[in-house]
A protein has these predicted regions:
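Fe-S ferredoxin-like electron-transfer domains
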Residues: 48-52, 57-193
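Extended, non-catalytic structural segments that build the interaction scaffolds
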Residues: 9-11, 143-144
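N-terminal cofactor/phosphate-binding cores enriched in small/glycine residues
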Residues: 4, 11-70, 79-80
Length: 201
């Protein structure tokens, strides 16, 4: 197996070719925050919290999907990186339900933890805030899109089970993860099964 030599915050580490920056950082013992990442399930870089600086890249890159190259120098905690993460958190909170005290994840919330670490509150961006009614349309799921941060973890896990009942719908500020229609489900399951038959993951 071909190994690549990189540095993460000055720490030298060797990782297999094809490894991501996130994997290299973890091998070096460096923590990079993530909200959407789930190894081998949801590696899409949707949340943008894992951005880092890397030599050879034109701007900040998402560590969970960006592959390392030989000799790459990665910086995970520069002022530029911290500012980008803070802005991303502020944007997430701009449309987020801030009733943390009544939330079952309060004090065990990845978003809450990162907001405290980066000094983020809910007032950086004001404007239109979509609101959603609780979705009790199935006996198996209760959806509260007011708390959804669009990480798409639920979508990835659902698709892995070839259920495809949940998906990202609409666009822009109206994007939400919600139940697919029967037609959307059939189309998505057909696509997933076709890709599996062809060996595409």
């Amino acid at each position: 197996m071909e190994m690549l030599n990189v540095t993460v915050n000055g720490i030298a580490v060797s990782v297999p070719k094809g490894a991501t920056i996130l994997e290299a950082a973890r091998a070096a013992g460096v923590e990079i925050p993530t909200l959407c990442y789930m190894k081998e399930k949801n590696e899409i870089g949707a949340c943008r919290i894992c951005v880092v600086e890397a030599t050879g890249a034109r701007g900040l890159v998402t560590a969970c999907v960006y592959p390392v190259t030989e000799g790459m120098a990665i910086q995970t905690n520069t002022p530029k990186v911290r500012a980008a993460r803070k802005t991303t958190l502020e944007l997430i909170l701009s449309t987020h339900d801030m009733n943390c005290l009544s939330c079952s994840r309060s004090t065990n919330c990845e978003l809450q933890k990162l907001c405290l670490e980066y000094g983020v509150d809910s007032h950086a961006f004001e404007g239109f805030k979509p609101t959603y009614e609780l979705d009790y349309s199935t006996p198996h799921l209760v959806r509260d899109n007011n708390k959804c941060i669009l990480c798409r973890r639920c979508v990835a896990v659902c698709e892995e089970q070839y259920v495809a009942v949940i998906g990202a719908n609409n666009r822009g500020i109206d994007t939400n993860c919600s139940l697919h229609t029967a037609t959307q489900r059939r189309q998505r399951i057909h696509l997933l099964l076709s890709l599996t038959r062809w060996g595409v993951e």
